[in-house]
Structure formats: C-alpha cells, structure tokens
C-alpha cells in the first residue's frame, strides 16, 4: 500500500511540474485532426465574351444587265444629220416624218411618193414632157443626152428614149413604162449597146464592163437616184438592175452630186405627174433608209 502511494505521489508531482491539471491528465482529450488548409483556388477569369459576329454584309445586288440594243433594219443610217425641209418644198413633203430611219422611213416616204403620183401618163405621151425635162438651157430645142452628155436636138432621128430600168425587167409594164422619172433622152446607138444590161462599177466614159454597163462618171449619180426611185415607188428588186445591189447605187449616189439638170427634171415631172424623186431633192434620204456610203445632206 505504501508503495502504491509513493508511486501515485510521484505521478502527481510530475503532472504538477508539467503544468497540466490532474483533470486534464486523467481526461484524455480527443485529438481534433488538423485539416491542411486548402490552397484557395485561383479564381477563374471571367470568360471573355465572344465577339459578336458581325452581320454578314449582304451581297451587292447584281445590276440588271443592260439590254442589247435592238438591231436596226438592214443598213440603217448611222448618221444623225438634222433634216430641215426647204421652204419651197414644205408643202410637198407635209406630213412626212423625217425623224424615222430604215424601213420605217422607207415605208413612209414610199407611201407619200405613191400618193403624190396622181397622174399616170402613157408611154406615148412622154415626148411633150421629156423635151422640157431634158432640155439644154443653153441650146433651145436641144436635150442633154444620158450617158454621153451631148447636146442634141430632142427630135433628131439619132435620139430615142432610154428606160433606165429596162422594160424587160419591169413588173408592171403599163404604169412603170410611162413613169417619167426613169425615162431619159439618149443616143440611139448607145441605148442599143446598153440594152438591158445591169449597171456595174467602172470608171471614165459610159461603156460595157464585163457583163454589165457603166453609165459614166458624169451620170452614175443620176442613174442611182432614178433606180432608187423605182425601188421606192414600185418595190422593184435590186438584182434586176445592179451587179452589186443597193450598195452600188448608194456609192454612186454619194460620189456624184445632184446636177442642175436633175433638179430641172424633178420640177418638170412634178408638174406632169404630181410626184417628185425625193433622192434628187436630198440624196441623204437614201442614206437614212439604206445606210451605205453617206451622201450629202442638202437640207441642213
């Protein structure tokens, strides 16, 4: 017992030296596990909001295709010459729309020319008018002969009447045969040599060229304007009269200007049968219809 007491006393002394109370020593404190403090998570950076997509640029609407320029009628005039009808001809051409071109203008001018042709002469009536139409102003009683340009008595036995558009190639021998606009005083032998040959290109004097007839440098424009009148009035085909169709007539119309004799004929024939050859009044009217070599616009 004494031994136990001594051991207990020693134990208490040790406790006293450690500074702990007897209750603390006797009551075992539960060990509170110490948590290792967690390293605080680095806060996430707020997500950068996505850059909003730019709205797609709408496609530039396609420009409507420029419509193709409608094709003009065959060989329309590319010229834009202004037409000013002379005062002395305004009454005659009243109602004609000179702003038109191509076939539209051809149809209008043809209708006007036909309407004005109110007196139809028989072929047997020609001399009383042609003797005035083809008269040589410098020599009373004489006529200027087609193709040669000679001045000769109109009623001479060596003179007869040339159909510039041959009778054998007319479609209506009656009315067309007596139309003064394509009848000319001519040397009988020259007329016979020409026969019904189509007109063709050449140079110099009137003569045969290959299978055609060249009317001379001096008269090729006269011939072209008479032939174009016959096409306009009667719609006679070009291949009956020219080896190069309307192109040759347009070339001659441009190269050989209207003569004083042609103007004289136009005035006399208007008095006789009512209508005029519009291509003598202004060669440029042919250019407005068929194009080709541009002729002089005498109505500016």
Predicted regions and their residues:
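Aromatic-lined ligand-binding clefts that engage carbohydrates, nucleic acids, or primary amines
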Residues: 81-154, 247-249, 269
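Bacterial Sec-dependent N-terminal signal peptides
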Residues: 14-84, 88
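Positively charged n-region of N-terminal signal peptides that target proteins for export
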Residues: 1-4
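Short, compositionally biased low-complexity segments
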Residues: 76-95, 193-205, 221
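Bacterial N-terminal signal peptides
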Residues: 7-15
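Short, Φ-rich (hydrophobic/aromatic) sequence segments
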Residues: 12, 102-113, 224-231
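Domain-level detector of nuclease and nuclease-like folds
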Residues: 147-300
